[in-house]
C-alpha cells in the first residue's frame, strides 16, 4: 500500500503519462474546421438596361415580390392628392338599371337658364314726302312700331283755296267758285295709323 503512487491530479502533467502507462489510447483534441474561402465578387454590369417593348410598364426589382391584391391596369398612374380622380366605369350594370327612365322636373335653375333677355331697340323710320301721296301706303308707325297700311282722309288745303279765287276772278262768283272744294283730287291727303290713330304724314297738293 505504501509503495503505490499517489493518484494523479486531474488536468495535471502526470495525466497523459498515466494513460500511456496503463496502455490506453490517447485521445486527440478536435481541430477547428478551416473557414471557407470567400468567392471572388464580380462587379455589376454597368451597361444600359434592356429595351422594353411596353413603355408604360415598369419592371419590378429582382428581389421584390408584389403583395397579393387587385392591381391598376397597365399604363395607369395614381393621381396626386390634389388631383380629381374620376370613378371607374362599372363593367357590369346593376340589377334593375336596365329599362328604367328617370324624369327630372324642371326647377327654378333650368327656368332661369332658358330665359332669354331681349333688348328693346328704338327703330327710327325716315319717311319721305314723295311716297305719301293720294293713296294708302305700307309703312311702320312711328308711335306703336307696327307694320301698317296708312288710313287716308281728305282735307281742304291750299290748292282748293287758290282755285276758288281763280273762279271768282273769271266771273264764277254765284256759287261756282266752291266747286274746287268738293273735289278730293284737289284736297290735301292726311295719312294716319289705323291702330293708334297717330298722325303720320300730310300730303299737301301744291300748284
From Swiss-Prot:
Principal location listed in the UniProt entry: membrane
Taxonomic superkingdom: Eukaryota
Residues in LITAF domain copies: 121-205
Stretches with biased composition (Pro residues): 1-13, 41-52
Assigned keywords, A-Z: Apoptosis, Endosome, Lysosome, Membrane, Metal-binding, Zinc
Sequence intervals crossing the membrane: none
Biological processes per GO annotation: apoptotic process
Chain positions covered by the region annotation Disordered: 1-54
Membrane topology qualifier: Peripheral membrane protein
Compartment(s) where it occurs, according to its Swiss-Prot or TrEMBL record: Late endosome membrane; Lysosome membrane
GO MF assignments: metal ion binding
Zinc-finger among keywords: no
Binding site for Zn(2+): 141, 144, 193, 196
Keyword Membrane attributed: yes
GO cellular component entries: cytoplasmic side of late endosome membrane; cytoplasmic side of lysosomal membrane
Pfam family, one: zf-LITAF-like
Region annotation Membrane-binding amphipathic helix: where it falls in the sequence: 161-183
Function according to Swiss-Prot or TrEMBL: May act as a p53/TP53-apoptotic effector.
PANTHER family hit by this protein: CELL DEATH-INDUCING P53-TARGET PROTEIN 1, LIPOPOLYSACCHARIDE-INDUCED TUMOR NECROSIS FACTOR-ALPHA FACTOR
Assigned protein family: Belongs to the CDIP1/LITAF family.
Protein's name in the database: Cell death-inducing p53-target protein 1
Species annotation: Xenopus tropicalis (Western clawed frog)
Gene: cdip1
Amino acid at each position: 500500500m505504501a509503495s503505490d503512487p499517489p493518484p494523479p491530479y486531474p488536468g495535471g502533467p502526470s495525466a497523459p503519462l498515466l494513460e500511456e502507462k496503463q496502455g490506453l489510447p490517447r485521445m486527440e483534441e478536435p481541430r477547428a474546421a478551416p473557414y471557407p474561402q470567400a468567392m471572388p465578387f464580380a462587379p455589376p454590369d454597368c451597361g444600359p438596361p434592356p429595351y422594353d417593348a411596353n413603355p408604360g410598364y415598369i419592371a419590378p426589382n429582382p428581389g421584390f415580390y408584389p403583395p397579393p391584391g387587385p392591381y391598376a391596369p397597365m399604363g395607369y398612374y395614381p393621381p396626386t392628392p390634389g388631383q380629381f380622380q374620376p370613378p371607374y366605369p362599372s363593367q357590369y350594370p346593376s340589377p334593375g338599371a336596365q329599362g328604367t327612365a328617370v324624369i327630372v322636373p324642371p326647377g327654378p335653375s333650368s327656368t332661369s337658364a332658358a330665359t332669354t333677355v331681349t333688348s328693346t331697340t328704338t327703330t327710327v323710320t325716315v319717311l319721305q314726302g314723295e311716297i305719301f301721296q293720294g293713296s294708302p301706303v305700307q309703312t311702320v308707325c312711328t308711335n306703336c312700331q307696327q307694320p301698317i297700311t296708312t288710313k287716308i282722309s281728305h282735307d281742304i288745303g291750299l290748292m282748293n283755296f287758290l282755285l276758288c279765287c281763280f273762279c271768282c276772278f273769271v266771273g264764277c262768283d254765284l256759287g261756282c267758285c266752291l266747286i274746287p272744294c268738293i273735289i278730293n283730287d284737289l284736297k290735301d291727303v292726311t295719312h294716319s295709323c289705323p291702330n293708334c290713330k297717330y298722325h303720320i304724314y300730310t300730303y299737301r297738293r301744291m300748284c
